Amino acid sequence: MDRLTWLRSFLALAIFLAVARCSPAQTSVRVVQVYVALADNQHQGIVPVPAKLGDGDAPASNLYWGAAFGVKTYFRGSRDWELVYAKPGPTSSILERCVFRYRTRAIYLVADAYRGSEIRQALTDFLSAAAGLRGESLSLTNNRSTLVLTIGGGADLVAYVGHDAFMDFQIEPIHGTRGKPSRPVIVLACDSKYFFAPYLKEAGASPLLWTTGLMAPEAYTLKAAIDGWIADEDGESIRSHAAEAYNKYQHCGSLAALHLFATGW
């Protein structure tokens, strides 16, 4: 092999190794997992809503899923997200699972609609994920390839949307693994900072956004918080964006909305 050929081979190998080293960072996928407990007039201690919105067995019309500001409908109508998967859930507790793809980055949002009467299971699964437990795989297949998402305890951001059932009952705390990085969580439920704090401390999670009073856990607030997380904003910026979104739809005043949300401990 002459010197010129050797140099060309060396440069080709160097370029290949450089690309190989960069590829994981460029192609890494981030996952947001959202646990939605469907509103249920019969099985939850909520202020009753119209029957159609409060039927915990009917996700298509439910206040927190299929209604105008429910998670599925609101994200499906967003210009930032594309619905790529919608099927019945993997267990009887989950009536529907939807996956949304962020249009400009490799980010996926997996949302599970839990039967209203299964709110205890929804909370247990949320806290398990917050603790980094029960990681699962979800395969998304199109005509060209298969993408495997790590969900549950393997998700990068975990959120709960629904009634704060810890006002009604308690469950056994779920302990996170010591030494693991703290997982950011969003809890959109009434007065969640007070009621969820003991559980999230045991789980070893980091509260990115939660609440300090009664509120409507609708999807515009969730989207604002996730948008901030995608943009790598700090907790206070995410809190401000969430408050702006909440005030836009609830007309409660910007200061009142800001006081309704908190970040960190």
Regions found by a protein language model. Give the residues of each.
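Bacterial N-terminal signal peptides
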Residues: S9-A20
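Short loop/turn segments at strand-loop or loop-helix junctions that form parts
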Residues: Q33-Q42, D112-Y114, V161-H163, G213
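Bacterial N-terminal signal peptides that target proteins for export
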Residues: M1-L11
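Boundary/activation segment at the start of structured domains
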Residues: C22-Y85, G89
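Caspase-like cysteine protease fold
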Residues: E236-W265
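Catalytic cores of nucleophile-dependent amide-cleaving enzymes
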Residues: V148-G228
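Sec/Tat-exported extracytoplasmic proteins
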Residues: F75, R79, A130, R134, ...
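Functional beta-strand-loop-alpha-helix junction segments that form "active/interaction loops"
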Residues: P59-Y64, A68-I151
